[in-house]
């Protein structure tokens, strides 16, 4: 990586000049009703789209006033508590929720089995991808590692640039399939090169769920308990709401 110290003096001068020449009067934000970040000045989330894919209720009306409340999370009109209760005891809560968010309805048994089979088929990375992309440039910032991996995967995608729905669904399924591998392998590379830990690359098992494969690939002995897998499965389900609508 470039030696930033070599240009530190000049960069400091450039920074001061940039700040001086690009200052914005704070009163203009209120004058033109410009949102700063994802919330307005009253703390309300900024409306960025109109969908029923997901919704978060963080406020309620009391005496004509909006006040914070115990949050409610909805996926396609389903309260997430109801989803978790309905999927309790099943191995594929995350997969069922992914089907719901992508396709708009809860899957039946056959549909869920078909969807999880698709995920298993796509849970593979290009030849030497782990070595050449993940291991050769490990990062302490896992989001940086994931971003780089996804951008590089685009070079292996024959459907890149296509906008038809089928191609985009295929791309979504492929990304859902490989993200656990990208995350775990990226962590192991960082742990080995930056922290002096051990390196081990475990392959995913097509018969296991996403949560189970995450734990299998993460652990040195590939072992985990049913409780750990269940808790992680629910955690993955809850974290699916991140800018989805």
Pin down the residues of each PLM region.
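Hydrophobic alpha-helical bundle cores within soluble ligand-binding/oligomerization subdomains
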Residues: 1-245
């Amino acid at each position: 990586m470039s030696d930033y110290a070599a240009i530190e003096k000049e960069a400091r001068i450039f920074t001061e000049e940039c700040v001086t020449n690009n200052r914005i009067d704070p009163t203009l934000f209120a004058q033109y009703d410009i949102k700063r970040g994802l919330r307005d000045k009253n703390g309300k989330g900024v409306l960025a789209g109109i969908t029923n894919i997901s919704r978060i209720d963080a406020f309620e009306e009391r005496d004509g006033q909006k006040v914070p409340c115990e949050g409610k999370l909805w996926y396609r009109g389903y309260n997430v508590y109801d989803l978790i209760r309905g999927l309790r005891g099943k191995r594929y809560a995350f997969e069922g929720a992914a089907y719901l968010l992508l396709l708009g309805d809860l899957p039946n048994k056959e549909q869920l089995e078909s969807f999880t089979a698709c995920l298993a088929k796509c849970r593979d990375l290009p030849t030497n991808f782990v070595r050449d992309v993940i291991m050769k440039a490990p990062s302490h910032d896992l989001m940086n590692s994931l971003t780089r991996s996804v951008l590089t995967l685009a070079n292996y995608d024959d459907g890149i640039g296509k906008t038809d729905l089928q191609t985009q669904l295929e791309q979504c399924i492929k990304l859902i399939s490989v993200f656990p591998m990208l995350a775990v392998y990226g962590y192991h590379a960082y742990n080995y090169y930056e922290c002096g830990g051990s390196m081990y690359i475990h392959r995913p098992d097509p018969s296991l769920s996403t949560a189970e494969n995450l734990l299998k690939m993460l652990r040195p002995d590939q072992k985990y308990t049913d409780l750990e897998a269940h808790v992680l499965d629910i955690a993955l389900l809850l974290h699916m709401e991140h800018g989805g609508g």
